[in-house]
UniProtKB/Swiss-Prot annotation:
The record marks H178, R239 as: Transition state stabilizer. It catalyses: acetate + ATP = acetyl phosphate + ADP. It is an enzyme of class 2 (transferase). Homodimer. This is Acetate kinase 2. It comes from Neisseria meningitidis serogroup B (strain ATCC BAA-335 / MC58). PROSITE patterns: ACETATE_KINASE_1 (PS01075), ACETATE_KINASE_2 (PS01076). Pathway: Metabolic intermediate biosynthesis; acetyl-CoA biosynthesis; acetyl-CoA from acetate: step 1/2. Its EC number is 2.7.2.1. Pfam families: Acetate_kinase (PF00871).
Length: 399
């Protein structure tokens, strides 16, 4: 292990994922997962060399408390003084950032201005930055924007059909998210296929509690499903995805809800959870559906049908498709979701080999389409932490 370690922080609305990455080897020295940080049941789990230890965050139910506990763990293992820089995943960087950036006060001001665009994520991201600055004074902090990868989209893909004045005044456009994941997965898929990335018309489906799909042509994002905020597009764990905007006015007029209540419902109570009335967790729903739970069955049907429609539409952006790639927690592990989705797409020449689909789970990457089939279908586990660490080291001048 070298003395050039990068701390990567990924603060969600109620979670904290942390990883200490060795700059030289790219290996994970220590990782942590803080969960339910906004509740009295907050806990943080540390993983060092495969040994896990869970600690309650009693009285520290916030991101700052979780970072403080992480600091204690680093000191316990003699890692604190080896940390040379800190990288942060930032959900929404607005129009300004097309690449990662060293964080100063001007950047913090921009991130605060983007809070209305990602109200669930940016406040948590900012909390993580402030906590890191407090606990690691003097170290450089780097922001890696989830939106930056999609700044290459053509105007026809990112423009909303609303008056120009509104678009300009409020920077009202499609931004896209999961860009850090796409930056890692796309070249990995190209490596597996043995072809230059620039020669592959690729569609990547990042499927987790949040989910999006991106069309990549000539190695660049040309279209994506998430939009002005992360709610647009696919059916997600608790987010509705695409929905008629008229729902807002209808519910405020007829259901006695205000805009904030509708927004909370569409972000936190919809998606798989809303349809199934059971869970936002795909694993739970797959088991329940097999046992005859109608809500779970319908939720998975709606999810996979919507996903297949988006895959077909992204082929327009690419001008065809050479490879479909699944990533993210669901994409990497759920053979049933992959198989059901691809079953809708045989008209595009997409097929799945049942044996390969069964094998490519739990961290295993590779091709899951038949050997004589084209386009290819792949599974590629993402590694956003490594991408963030690489950007952080480069901008912080850590060679």
């Amino acid at each position: 292990m070298s003395d050039q370690l990068i701390l990567v922080l990924n603060c969600g609305s109620s979670s904290l994922k942390g990883a200490v990455i060795d700059r030289k080897s790219g290996s994970v020295v220590l990782s942590c997962l803080g969960e339910r940080l906004t509740t009295p049941e907050a806990v943080i789990t540390f993983n060092k060399d495969g040994n896990k230890r869970q600690v309650p965050l009693s009285g520290r139910n916030c991101h700052a408390g979780a970072v403080g506990m992480l600091l204690n763990e680093l000191e316990k293992h003699g890692l604190h003084d080896r940390i040379k820089a800190i990288g942060h995943r930032i959900a929404h960087g607005g129009e300004k950032y097309s690449e990662s950036v060293l964080i100063d006060q001007a950047v913090m001001d921009e991130l605060n201005a983007c809070i209305p665009l990602a109200p669930l994520h940016n406040p948590a991201n900012i909390s993580g930055i402030l906590a890191a600055q407090e606990h690691f004074p003097g170290l450089p902090n780097v922001g890696v924007m989830d939106t930056s990868f999609h700044q290459t989209m053509p105007e026809r893909a990112y423009t909303y059909a609303v008056p120009r004045e509104l678009r300009k005044k409020y920077a009202f456009r499609r931004y896209g998210f999961h860009g850090t994941s796409m930056r890692y997965v796309a070249p990995e898929a190209a490596r597996i296929l043995g072809k230059p990335l620039e020669d592959i018309r690729m569609i990547i489906a990042h499927l987790g509690n949040g989910a999006s799909i991106t069309a990549i042509k000539n190695g660049k994002s040309v279209d994506t499903s998430m939009g002005f905020t992360p709610i647009e597009g696919l059916v997600m764990g608790t987010r509705c995805g695409d929905i008629d905007p008229g729902v807002y006015s209808y519910l405020t007029s007829h259901a006695g809800m205000d805009v904030a209540q509708v927004d909370e419902m569409l972000n936190k109570k919809s998606g798989l959870l809303g349809i199934s009335e059971l869970s936002n967790d795909c694993r739970t729903l797959e088991i329940a559906a097999d046992e005859g739970h109608e809500g779970a069955r319908l939720a998975l049907e709606v999810m996979t049908y919507r996903l297949a429609k988006y895959i077909a539409s992204m082929a327009v952006g690419c001008g065809g498709v050479d490879a479909l790639v699944f990533t993210g927690g669901i994409g990497e592990n759920s053979r049933n979701i992959r198989a059901k989705t691809v079953s809708y797409l045989d008209f595009l020449g997409l097929h799945i080999d049942t044996k390969a689909n069964m094998e490519k789970r739990y961290g295993n990457s590779g091709i899951i389409s038949p050997t004589d089939s084209s386009p290819a279908v792949l599974v590629v586990p993402t590694n956003e932490e490594l991408m963030i660490a690489c950007d952080t080291a480069e901008l912080a001048g850590i060679l």
